[in-house]
Amino acid sequence: MMKLSTMKKVVATVDKKWRSPLAEFILERWGFDRHSVFYWRASANFIFMFQHHGKKYYLRFNDSCERNLTLIKEELKLVQYLGSQALAIAQPVLSKNNNLVEVVITPIGTFYAVVFEALDGEHLSFEEMNEEQLFLWGEMLGTIHENLKNVPNDLAIKRPSWKDDLEKVKEWIPSNEIAAMKELEMISEWADQLPITKENFGIIHYDFELDNVRFNEITIGALDFDDCAYYWYVADIVYALRDAGKFRVTTPAIKTFIKGYKSSTFLEEELLEEANGFERLHHLVSFARLLRSVDKDYSKEEPGYLMDLRKNLVSLINNYRLSFEQNHK
């Protein structure tokens, strides 16, 4: 989640018809069909949907204070590699300047922008999924991991690791968050003792939830690799299945997902026993990111959508804080 102050200044450019002159200005570097650019959402990134020559695409951009340009380029390198392995992964589109990422300077800030092809298929909620779809979902994640285990050495993709994430946690959590600091110390010690091998550790998607998956009959497409990082592969399984509730390998949906995963790649099943630790690691990182997001640029003049979002995020922060306090009574 980006800073709410960043969100506010960009969403303010969106009119009642969901159009934005800022988005259209950015898209001049790719081209677009007139009156086809519409705001879709803002969370970790700003997303606009549009058409060019009648074909559907998505514009993704963010303020330069939110993302690292080098890391975006490394993400796209990974996405292109997976696409070259015949996986249905949303691919970036070259701009008129032959760039995958455009740096766009505007009166309200500098933005890093990427355009992606739209994936075929439909979005499903967890409650809608049948056993076959759960299997395919797990199979797709396993296929992604299997390919990432075999990334050529000359590709050398540079992305953050779990250690980098915990360094950010340390930076963003104030020292008066006593329970969170205790949780950070405990999780750091726990993660340090986990085994690391080529088969159990590497680049993960990090956010392979159903929002980032498209089902197309018997195939699955994936998108949104912007949080990809070096973690244990099991963490990707645990994080993908958050909608299933508390992670238990005996839960039917989780069993089916894991069965699909194992049909595509090796799974070090002993690490599934560490699911609670991975959940707590995710909570800690999410807590820190939300604290940063709910920044101090607050005003009673905020638009209604932002006030509601701020309240929801503060509620999440309080829930995480309570869980840390319960862990360290």
Swiss-Prot record:
Belongs to the pseudomonas-type ThrB family. SUPFAM superfamilies: Protein kinase-like (PK-like). GO terms for molecular function: amino acid kinase activity. This is Uncharacterized protein BH3399. Transmembrane segments: none annotated. It comes from Halalkalibacterium halodurans (strain ATCC BAA-125 / DSM 18197 / FERM 7344 / JCM 9153 / C-125). It comes from the Bacteria.
